[in-house]
Amino acid sequence: NKDGYLMEGDGCKMGCLTRKASYCVDQCKEVGGKDGYCYAWLSCYCYNMPDSVEIWDSKNNKCGK
């Protein structure tokens, strides 16, 4: 299992600034993660996701490209 930032379809981190408090927890559980939170009120970070879930990686950042 792995931890990391959820990604939108455009390759950017999944934002959570204007979402309800449980948004990231719900999104993380939807992909099979155990828990999650809105990091610095900006992006969803998840714990214990299946290895098959694609997460944001600074080395392979496609956001805005």
Curated annotation (Swiss-Prot):
GO biological process: defense response
Keywords, comma-separated and alphabetical: Amidation, Disulfide bond, Secreted
Gene Ontology CC annotations of this record: extracellular region
Domain LCN-type CS-alpha/beta: 2-64
Subcellular location: Secreted
Gene3D superfamilies listed in its UniProt record: Knottin, scorpion toxin-like (3.30.30.10)
UniProt GO molecular function: sodium channel inhibitor activity; toxin activity
Pfam families, per database record: Toxin_3
Family label: Belongs to the long (4 C-C) scorpion toxin superfamily. Sodium channel inhibitor family.
Protein role: Alpha toxins bind voltage-independently at site-3 of sodium channels (Nav) and inhibit the inactivation of the activated channels, thereby blocking neuronal transmission.
Record's protein name: Sodium channel toxin 2
Organism of origin: Tityus metuendus (Scorpion)
Lineage: Eukaryota, Metazoa, Ecdysozoa, Arthropoda, Chelicerata
